[in-house]
Amino acid sequence: MSVRANPPVPSQRRRGAASEPGAAPRGSRNWPLLIDICLAVAVGLAVLLVHDVPYMLRHSFWVDEAWVADTVRAPIGLTHSLGLITPVAWTFLLRLVPFGGPERLRLVPLAFTMLAAAAGYLLGRELHLDRYITGILTGAAVLLSPALLERDDLKQYTAEAFASVVLMILVARLENEWKIRRLVAIAAVSSIGLLFTNTAIFVGVAAMASLGLECLVNRRYRRILDLAAASAGMLVVSLAIYVTLIRPETSSKLTAYWDPFYVPTGSGARAFHFIYRQLAGLAPYAGFRPFLVDALGVLAGIAALIWLRRVALAAMLPITLAIVIVASAAREYPFGDLRTSTFWLVLVPVLMAIAVSAAGHAAGRIDRRAPLLVGAAALAIWVPATNVYVRSHTIPNEDVHSQVTYLDSHFRRGDVVLVSYAASYAFAYYYPATPSFPVGDGPNGHVVAYPKLPYMVVLPQRQPSNLIDGLAEARRKIAAEPPGSRGRIWIIRSHQTPTEIKTWDRLLAGQPVQVIRVGPDPVLLYLYRPR
């Protein structure tokens, strides 16, 4: 049995109208759905125009991507631990990419970007305003979201954005018509979604809380029991996934890395200042550069949803933000980092698009052309405003791939290869020989090693003592070779700290070293000859 959650907004047709006398034939009733599907697919495919796909498929992985990419070269049993807190199911998807060059793994986040854009269109469809116009506006909001346009890297953040939009769709559908299976769908996406994202539960809890608020506002008290049961199931499944898969991979090193993004708890004034500063810093990636414009756009969207009697949708983003802030204060999730904020930043332009569509719908009572004109005017502002992010190249320029290619084509018998700590993860992905990943002091609890290759020296850390010991070991390997067959020492480096650079300069000062420029970090060829 189903019950309507809200009275229809003025533009909605009464359910079952198609069965009344004079209704259109069944075949013609399918055309709007077919058009919706085609438009959703078109918006999704438009992602290929606003992202530089050739750049994504040829730009070398940098260190933060490389240790995720290494999961496809490791035994399948190491996939979860190597990926650290990267969602395990998302990480397994990397093994399924069937075509492309070495950087083909970025097709996974690209696919989720396309799904998010298509879902953006479908969200507009569920609002029951001006069907195609609203969908195009909300689809364009996701498609040209600066936060998503910046995300070409090998991370799960686009999947998190997709999950957020999907949860908004599910809440809208539940507002359209209350059905238990729709409520269960929200609980399932929010909990099982943790296998693909780290943030679905934040938005899911916000969705359930928002629906509870709507039930109170509309005095639908009996539905609160359904919400409580679905929420309990959602939290139980989420807790099980968190305890077994996520929490064990959270380390003190990771917590320390995100320390600047945790809300201070010692003073209310400091906390408020921190939150404002972080939000202001993210404003350019929310929609428009001035923070005030973004804030007014969000408030307009919330007001429009309240006018449409969609209290749950109106409350979702504010409650999501509140949850993230609380999680940050508890040192469980960073607040204010662009990458980890993508999942909620993408909702900001969506709310703006809803405000525009609602305004056009209201104006349509005066002039039927108003929704189209208002929508066109909004796109005329939105497209140029986000153009600076279109086809942007924001992946850090660390080209271990070129270094490995040069090394592989010039390596000779007797040579020794010395790989720096930070370069080792990309090296492990690109170098043809199969690496091993023993437990160590790496960002994911593993380091790179080549126990079957005696000519390989991989530094386990980046302290000066590690560089000194590694270079000494490489020299010993050269000295141990017969005088007539001694090779050279290849030094592969990337993502260096200032201390590393100074240490290398000191260690190699006055030594016979050739600098071979094949990328941002040149290959060093050390012609060491023992005395």
Where are the regions that the model predicts?
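Membrane-proximal helix-loop-helix interfaces that form the catalytic/acceptor-binding platform
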Residues: 3, 28, 32-531
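Short, Lys/Arg-rich, polar N-terminal cytosolic tail immediately upstream
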Residues: 2-32
